[in-house]
């Protein structure tokens, strides 16, 4: 038997918040702020957005490792946060997240039509998230009521390691019956999510305007004047540079054009690991 390069994409592996649902990725961000506040520790929205894309326990651990947040915690408790302290914050985070996830459950405008088109062109739709399964079950339920059902879902606690490790993306490959990782494209609005796709050997597409990096509602995004929007694009492109996404687009609605381009590159023999 001889190896043959795939000639077209077989699956898109999609993130959830900031990619398909919750324009601006507000659901997790605000809850981090509220969870820390219950321990009398102030964390700003901007600080909370920093590690977005990681599993939520790891996200809280990363926040607690930031010197300014660790110092605020020390002033309240007389010590810097231990792993047990992180777990305590996480345990408060979880019910808050489940309780309020519905507030930010709307599909990103145009996403459903875009994904319907991808499926009509033969693509399977996998998905993964930094949410644990108990939260993802609720997210999936709410999305289904709005018409979106992924072919497979992998939560961050269903693999040994979450992002930026490749395990969740690869779990989708196995479950969907894809025969080559190079026939997959990973779409995400965070650096850890793009690294996940890169490490899994997939094509990667970073979303610039619909997710955590821009951090605006759909209405806020649409209201930006052209100069401000272009400046924000440049800032966010620079933020993603180290993770080396193959493509950067504003929202998932530009994905069909990317799919067409990737298929042309695959047909020419190009592979995602080589670029």
UniProtKB/Swiss-Prot annotation:
GO cellular component labels: cytosol
Cofactor binding note: Binds 1 Mg(2+) ion per subunit.
Cofactor dependency: Mg(2+)
Superkingdom of this protein's organism: Bacteria
Residues annotated to bind Mg(2+): 15, 17, 189
Keyword Hydrolase among record annotations: yes
Catalytic activity: phosphonoacetaldehyde + H2O = acetaldehyde + phosphate + H(+)
Root EC class: hydrolase
SUPFAM superfamilies in UniProt: HAD-like
Active site: 15, 56
Pfam families tied to this protein: Hydrolase (PF00702)
Listed name of the protein: Phosphonoacetaldehyde hydrolase
Organism lineage: Bacteria, Pseudomonadati, Pseudomonadota, Gammaproteobacteria, Pseudomonadales
